[in-house]
Amino acid sequence: MSAFIVSQPALERNARILREVADAAGCRVVLALKGFSTWPCFEDLRPLLDGCCASGLWEALLARRRFGKHVLTYSPAYAPEEIAELAEISDHLD
């Protein structure tokens, strides 16, 4: 069994910096679930980030159900049986 410790103050401080950069640049900042998918932290990140970037069906489902904002999904290939569901839950599908 593994355990991870996340510094909430550091996470929020970094997310606020990203929010400031996004506002100044006029762009969106999304959470890459491949790099950080610790969904119990999503509640603190949700107000500061614009959504999530997923790399497949399971990450897109996590983003839609737990983060609840813009879901961008990208993969070099998709399983044919997953495309309909991905199109339904993703705001952008590449």
Regions found by a protein language model. Name each.
Residues 1-6:
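Generic N-terminal amphipathic, Lys/Arg-enriched alpha-helix
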Residues 9-17:
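A non-catalytic, amphipathic alpha-helix used as a structural packing/dimerization or gating element
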Residues 27-94:
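Active-site-proximal beta-alpha core segment in soluble small-molecule metabolic enzymes
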